[in-house]
């Protein structure tokens, strides 16, 4: 049985959400909103708001989503650097990111770090205590990829110490995140419920993409994207897709 899927159908939605978390964290939106509602006007105006322009954004994983974030960040006047072990330097440059030779190099230069990488044995707890230690003081950290890429104990320690000034998290090691998680009680963390890719537009695009693959099979054509490559040998009788 061929299993088809819809890669890239929610890339714009996730990239926009990542950029929203970046801006929200830099502008300290959640804290300022809370203080303004309490009529603490003066305090709200001096809660560490700073500019995006001129800051260095480090993108970990410059795929479908990362390249879109790079384009958005450049429009805000950010310097964009990227690390992706699966892409050559020339391709990273073409995708709008200055290539970094290693994760450590990126961590040491970025004012803002955003993760766009799958969870694999190689990326499990990639953002651990050692990685946090390599970051610049006062960094902003954003993750809209997979929760287990981050070691939340190390992340929490960094947030409490001020090493990580602010964070925007759409994903967590365990989901739903427990209501007693300390991350939920940090003023310098914006949290959302793994919804970056869930928009009306992305759901429609996903449905249309999968339906198109099903129709190709019914027409006797090979689908464009098959999730289980072991069935490819059983699809050789199908003709290449015409559309």
Question: Model-found features: residue ranges?
Answer:
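Residues at the starts of beta-strands that form the adenosine-phosphate
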Residues: 78-79
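Rossmann-like adenosine-cofactor binding region
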Residues: 85-182
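Glycine-rich Rossmann-fold phosphate-binding loop(s) that bind the pyrophosphate
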Residues: 62-63
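Glycine-rich phosphate/pyrophosphate-binding beta-alpha loops
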Residues: 9, 144-146, 177, 193-202
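N-terminal Rossmann-fold NAD(P) dinucleotide-binding loop
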Residues: 66-67
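NAD(P)-dependent dehydrogenase/reductase Rossmann-like domain
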Residues: 202-243
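Phosphate-binding beta-alpha-beta segment of Rossmann-like dinucleotide-binding domains, i.e.
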Residues: 6-56, 71, 223-227
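Active-site glycine-centered loops adjacent to acidic/histidine catalytic or metal-binding residues
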Residues: 170, 194, 220
């Amino acid at each position: 049985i061929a299993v088809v899927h819809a890669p890239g159908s929610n890339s714009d939605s996730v990239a926009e959400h990542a950029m929203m978390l970046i801006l929200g964290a830099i502008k300290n939106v959640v804290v300022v909103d809370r203080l303004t509602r309490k009529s603490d006007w003066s305090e709200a105006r001096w809660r560490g708001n700073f500019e995006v322009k001129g800051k260095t954004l480090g993108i970990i994983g410059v795929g479908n989503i990362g390249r879109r974030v790079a384009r958005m960040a450049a429009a805000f006047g950010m310097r964009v650097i990227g690390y992706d072990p699966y892409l050559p330097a020339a391709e990273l440059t073409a995708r709008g990111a200055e290539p970094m030779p290693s994760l450590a190099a990126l961590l040491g230069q970025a004012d803002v770090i955003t993760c766009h990488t799958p969870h694999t044995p190689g990326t499990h707890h990639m953002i651990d205590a050692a990685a946090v230690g390599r970051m610049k003081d006062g960094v902003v950290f954003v993750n809209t990829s997979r929760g287990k890429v981050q070691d939340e104990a190390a992340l929490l320690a960094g947030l409490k110490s001020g090493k990580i000034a602010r964070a925007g998290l759409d994903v967590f090691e365990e989901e739903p995140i427990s209501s007693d998680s300390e991350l939920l009680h940090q003023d310098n963390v914006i949290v959302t419920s793994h919804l970056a890719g869930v928009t009306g537009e992305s759901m429609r695009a996903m449905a249309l993409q999968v339906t198109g693959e099903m129709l190709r099979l019914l027409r006797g054509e090979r689908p464009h994207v098959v999730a289980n490559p072991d069935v490819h040998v059983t699809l050789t009788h199908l003709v290449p897709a015409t559309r």
